[in-house]
Amino acid sequence: VAFATSFTVCWTPYYVLGIWYWFDPEMLNRVSDPVNHFFFLFAFLNPCFDPLIYGYFSL
């Protein structure tokens, strides 16, 4: 459950932004580049959290 929650928390903002772009391509002008980059990088932090979660539950 913890891994699925971590995956969902990390990837949801990125996918929401992608779906928003799909329905409204003009949104790229309204959302700043740092926000786009943050969501993109936050999604790729998910594999970094997995060993931490595994280690925490292995104690």
UniProtKB/Swiss-Prot annotation:
Locations listed in the record: Cell membrane
Top-level taxon of the source organism: Eukaryota
Principal localisation: membrane
GO CC aspect terms: plasma membrane
Stretches of the chain found on the membrane's Cytoplasmic side: 1-2, 59
UniProt cross-references to InterPro entries, sorted A to Z: GPCR_Rhodpsn_7TM
Ribonucleoprotein in keyword set: no
Ranges facing Extracellular side: 24-37
Membrane topology: Multi-pass membrane protein
Record keywords: Cell membrane, G-protein coupled receptor, Membrane, Receptor, Transducer, Transmembrane, Transmembrane helix
SUPFAM superfamilies assigned to the protein according to its UniProt record, in alphabetical order: Family A G protein-coupled receptor-like
Keyword Transmembrane tagged: yes
Listed transmembrane segments: 3-23, 38-58
Recorded GO MF terms: G protein-coupled receptor activity
Known function: Receptor for gonadotropin releasing hormone (GnRH) that mediates the action of GnRH to stimulate the secretion of the gonadotropic hormones luteinizing hormone (LH) and follicle-stimulating hormone (FSH). This receptor mediates its action by association with G-proteins that activate a phosphatidylinositol-calcium second messenger system.
Family: Belongs to the G-protein coupled receptor 1 family.
Official protein name in the record: Gonadotropin-releasing hormone receptor
Lineage: Eukaryota, Metazoa, Chordata, Craniata, Vertebrata
